[in-house]
Curated annotation (Swiss-Prot):
Job of this protein: Prevents the cell division inhibition by proteins MinC and MinD at internal division sites while permitting inhibition at polar sites. This ensures cell division at the proper site by restricting the formation of a division septum at the midpoint of the long axis of the cell.
Protein encoded by which gene: minE
Protein source organism: Pseudomonas syringae pv. syringae (strain B728a)
UniProt keyword annotation of Repressor present: no
Family, per entry: Belongs to the MinE family.
A Pfam entry, by short name: MinE
One GO term (biological process): regulation of division septum assembly
Name of this chain's protein: Cell division topological specificity factor
């Protein structure tokens, strides 16, 4: 046994497999950090435009939220309507 063998990694793996494993961890972490989809602001803008055809509202009176529970996604839309 060489003294340098003691400091070497005991687990022999190819650099490609190590890189793949690290990339999978990074991708999983990024997916977990992404709480809102990219299309949500555009969807909110279009919904406000459609609602304005029927009711006089401001943009800040509409809140859009997307919630995911397992394989089900829930789009929640809250609109503060003006008094009549």
């Amino acid at each position: 046994m060489n003294i340098f063998d003691f400091f070497r990694d005991r687990k022999k793996g190819s650099t490609a497999s190590v890189a793949k494993e690290r990339l999978q961890i990074i991708v999983a972490h990024e997916r977990g950090q992404r709480s809102t989809p990219d299309y949500l602001p555009a969807l909110q803008k279009e919904l406000v435009e459609v609602i304005r055809k029927y009711v006089n509202i401001e943009s800040d009176q509409v809140q859009v939220a997307l919630e995911s529970q397992g394989s089900c996604s829930i789009l929640e839309l809250n609109i503060t309507l003006p008094d009549r």
